[in-house]
C-alpha cells in the first residue's frame, strides 16, 4: 500500500533529521556547558497561567480582553500527556465532543457553550476546519475563545473557536523529547529540537511516532500516527522576519464503532447505551479502516514599519485526505432488542485543498488622550473538495452503500453479530470507491479590531468585519437523480463591542456583545449534512447569533494566579430548519444561558492549579421538521427541550505539587452532567466523574521520569452521544511511563 510505503519514508526521514539535530545540539551544549542559565531553564516548570494570546487579533492582554478565553498551556499539555486535540479539550469545561460527519465519530467536532465549532478550528489564526483527528506533537498551546466571535475569525464561531499555536523556530538552542510506553500497547516518541545558527537564523523540527490500542478494549480499535513539522526563521531580532514551516501527519487506524442504545422493546432505560461489558467492540476489523493524511505549508513575512507598527502577511496551503470505512452499530430495525447488532457501513473519501492568505497591520498609536492597540487586515481563502465513499458489492453483484441483511435475517452472512459477545468474522464482499460530488468554497473579508484606552481605568474594545462568501457543490448523477449544481453567494457584517473597567491594575470588570454568522455551505464537502449546500437550501440567508457577556478577571498572588468569572447568553435566532421535504427557512431559534468560573496559575511556588466550572441552561426554543424519504415529522413538539451535546454542569481540575525538589505529583478530575444526543431528548449518556494522576521524578537536570494514570477507577462512561444508533464509550484505565529529556 502506498500509505505504508510513504510512512516508512517519513519515519526514516524523521529519524535521520532528529539524529542530525541531536548531534548538532549536543555538540553545541558541550561547547557552552559553562553557561548555567541554560541548565536552569532545562528543568524549570512553566506556569499553567497564560497572560497573552499568541493570536495577534487579541490586541490586548487577556486580563484586559472583554471575552472569555481558556488557554491550554504548554505545561498543562506536558503534565497530562494528552496526545490529541480531543483529549486536550477535555481539560476545558463547557466543551463537549460530538460525532462527526454522517455519524462518523472519528473527526474533531467540539461543541463550545452548546454550539458546534467544527467550522471554527484554526492553526495560528488561519481556519483549518476539515474533518480530521488533530495531534498535539507540534502544538505549543491551544486557545479556546468562547462566545460569538465572527468579527475576529469570520464565518461560524457561534459558541466559540479553537486556535492551535504551532511550534516554530525561535532564538536559542534546545533539544527535548519523550519516549513513552504503557498499557494497551502504548508506544510514543516525540522529539523537538531548535538550533540558533546566529545572524538571525534559527531552525526547528518536531517529530512524532505513535501507536496504541484503545484502553480497556480487547482486540478492538487501534491507532497509529507518524508526523514531522520542520520550520526555519530568518531575521530574528531584525525589523524584517520570515518564517517557513511545514506540517505532516499521517494516521492509520482501526476506528471504534461505539455502543448501540437500548430500545423500547427491551423494557430497559430506553435511549441509554446498552449495558454490555466495558470495552465491547462491534467494529468489523476485516473491513474497517481510517487513513488520514495532512500537509500544511506556511510562509509568514513580518516587517516593522516603525517601533509601534508591524505589517504581516501569512500564506498557508493545506492538503488533507480522510478515507474511512467504519461500522455504525445500527439499531434501526430492532436488532438490539433481539440481542444482535448490524454492521452498517459508513464511509467517506474526502480530498481537500485550501489556500489562505492573511494581510494584517498591527500596532499601537495615540489620538489625543486615547491610546489605541489595533489589528486591521484582509483575508482570502479558497477550498476545493472532492468527496465520495464506498459501495459494497456482494458475490451476486448486488450493490449497496450501507450493507446487506439489515434485519439480521441471515446470520450466516456475517453482517450481524451478537450484542453481548460480538465476534470477528471474515469480510467476503468487495468494496468499490465511488465519487459523489465536488465543492468549492471561497471567501474574502476585511476587518478592524481596536482596543482603546480612554483612561487607565476604562477600556473600549471594538471590532467590525465584512465577509463575502461563495459556495458551490456539483453533485454527480446517480441511479435515482440527475446531476445538478447548488450555489450560495452571500455577504454579511459582524461586529463586537466591549467595555472594561479596571478598578486596580490587576483586575478588570467587563461587559461585551458580539455577533456571528454562518452561511449555507460553510462546511461544503466535508462537514455535517445540515451545513452543506444543496438544491433545497441554497437560497437561505446566513444563520446569525449573538452573545451577551458580563465578567471579571483578576490576577492574585503577585500576578501568579488568575481568577475569571462570567455570565452570558448566546442566542441563535434564525437557524435553518426544514419546513417540508424540499423547503428550508430561517425560522429556528435556540439559546444558552450560562455561568462559568476559571482558576489558573500558581498558588505557591510549589503548587500549580488549573480548574474550571460551567453551568449551561440550553433550550431549543423553535424547531422545524425532520424530513426523510419525502416524509416529515413535526419537531415543534420538542420546543423547550435541552439542546443536544450540552451538559448542564461540567467541571475540570488539574493540580500539581512539588513535594520534594525532585518529585512532583499531580491529580485531576473531569465531571460532566447528563448529555442528550437528539432534540427529542430520548437518546442520552449519563453523567460521570473521571480521575487521573501523575508523578514526575527529576533524575537529573536533563532527564525526568513521568508516570500518568488516566481513569484511575476504570469508570465506564461515554464521551459522545449521537442523535441515533450509538454513543462513544471512553477509554478504560491506562498507564503510561515516559522518559522526558531537555537539553
From Swiss-Prot:
Signal peptide: 1-28
Alphabetized SUPFAM superfamilies for the sequence: Porins
One GO cellular component term: pore complex
Localization per Swiss-Prot or TrEMBL: Cell outer membrane
Domain TBDR beta-barrel: residue ranges: 172-743
Result, substituting residue 724 to C: Despite cross-linking with fluorescein, capable of binding ferric enterobactin or ferric catecholates at micromolar affinity in vitro
Listed Pfam families: Plug (PF07715), TonB_dep_Rec_b-barrel (PF00593)
Phenotype when the gene is knocked out: Deletion decreases sensitivity to siderophore-beta-lactam drug conjugates.
Homology family: Belongs to the TonB-dependent receptor family.
Annotated protein name in UniProt: Probable TonB-dependent siderophore receptor PiuA
Gene (name only): piuA
